[in-house]
């Protein structure tokens, strides 16, 4: 199955930002989203490959897809119902 990163409800451009800024921006953006909405994050900080999946697990959001093979890294998250 091919994931279409282009159908996200919102896009967060976090390129050029370094830890912890990308995850802080994700957290702030997700708080403003409706349950079930999707967020595409574009980032180039290597720590996001670890931090964003961990954030999703900890906060009960669904990491639908991630592309960490090329820059910018892309992460597609669905906001969890309990967040």
Curated annotation (Swiss-Prot):
One of its GO terms (molecular function) is sulfur carrier activity. PROSITE patterns: UPF0033. It comes from the Bacteria. Gene3D superfamilies: TusA-like domain. It is found in: Cytoplasm. One of its GO terms (cellular component) is cytoplasm. Belongs to the sulfur carrier protein TusA family. This is Sulfur carrier protein TusA. It comes from Aliivibrio salmonicida (strain LFI1238). The lineage of its organism: Bacteria, Pseudomonadati, Pseudomonadota, Gammaproteobacteria, Vibrionales. The gene is tusA.
